[in-house]
């Protein structure tokens, strides 16, 4: 699909926006993608995703759909299934890979048995947090099926959530019924883009304050991107190999971005894959375009 976009003049529908927690990021991604496609000669129709999107696509009959959606329903297999039923070609991963990768626990169940190192942990009900910690502190709470670090919190002994977490505590996880609780891994935040079957590079993400949350990802100046990351050669190679192996094992296509934590004190054994993103951001601050340059 990437080669087709590069070598042919097409009518491309860019799906963006929608109603997920990542709507604004998707609109920014979509606008940038549409502008880039027009620069290389394609005819582009921008579509802000709504529940009439199938009718709109049938009206314009594009040659291909560029999926610039993030979160539900554009990243979880729903839109992919619709496009399959309509017989429309589209970018990025298909229904099955998208449905698996959006579910962090299901992804772990598939990749960990293949020897891809991932953190332990388990799914908990958010209401149960008030009865006691699901893991020894520090630990990470994250929604099972959200991206862009939406709803992520690090719970430490020094956190202001209380011990156990108080019912009055205001945490970013509160809008979600189910959460994935994982041990906190000290060290570096890394990411690897895979594009058309090739791992591109390893970037270290260095937040200027706090951790690499939603604001740090999408606010200029809050995160330093070091590409290539300053790592031992064997860690760089391992991260790229793990990202490509995960991409292939899940059946992904086009572009993905795999996120890691790396604890230098543990050496190579301290490298953990956190998740695979099948709809990576394409904003001016996003990592896949940066690594692809």
What are these regions (language model features)?
Residues 183, 247-282, 292:
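Conserved metal-phosphate-binding beta-hairpin within the catalytic cores
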